[in-house]
Amino acid sequence: MKLSDIADNAGSRKKRMRVGRGIGSGKGKQSGRGGKGQTARSGVRIKGFEGGQMPMHRRLPKRGFNNIFRVEFAEINLDRLQEAVDAKKIDAGSVVNVEALVKGGVLRRAKGGLRLLGRGELKSKLNIEVHGATKTAIAAVEKAGGSVKILAPAKEEGEAA
């Protein structure tokens, strides 16, 4: 057997049908698309249309709303802070705040402020300034000999002080 002897099985590749080549071909005139109108044209799929049945997006009830005043906090856990101290990304002696974390590459940004969460263990004594913190996080920082200062909510750029 040679590479030149290899061929597809008979009938495995069906010949492409060229449509619109006269009624004698069997696929002339409407080319198998039914009647006229929108669906006879190319590239048309009516999104969400279920053949006249009430579509899913109208069968389901509306719920909730989008609060335009919602504040999104960047969140950081204690274990991540400890990793940053161990990797010398932040200095344990100085104040740990948003600016220090961004400068050290721990956070990318904290637009609405920073919130401290209590997952993990903190061994270093840190003085932390955040916009929010959980009770367990505050307790863990104070147990390690540090302190947590809660700041006023961060103001958006262009917002009146």
Curated annotation (Swiss-Prot):
It comes from the Bacteria. Gene3D superfamilies: 3.100.10.10. GO terms for molecular function: rRNA binding; structural constituent of ribosome. Keywords: Ribonucleoprotein, Ribosomal protein, RNA-binding, rRNA-binding. InterPro entries: Ribosomal_uL15, Ribosomal_uL15/eL18, Ribosomal_uL15/eL18_sf, Ribosomal_uL15_bac-type, Ribosomal_uL15_CS. GO terms for biological process: translation. Transmembrane segments: none annotated. Residues 1-42 are annotated as: Disordered. Binds to the 23S rRNA. This is Large ribosomal subunit protein uL15. It comes from Bradyrhizobium diazoefficiens (strain JCM 10833 / BCRC 13528 / IAM 13628 / NBRC 14792 / USDA 110). The lineage of its organism: Bacteria, Pseudomonadati, Pseudomonadota, Alphaproteobacteria, Hyphomicrobiales. The gene is rplO.
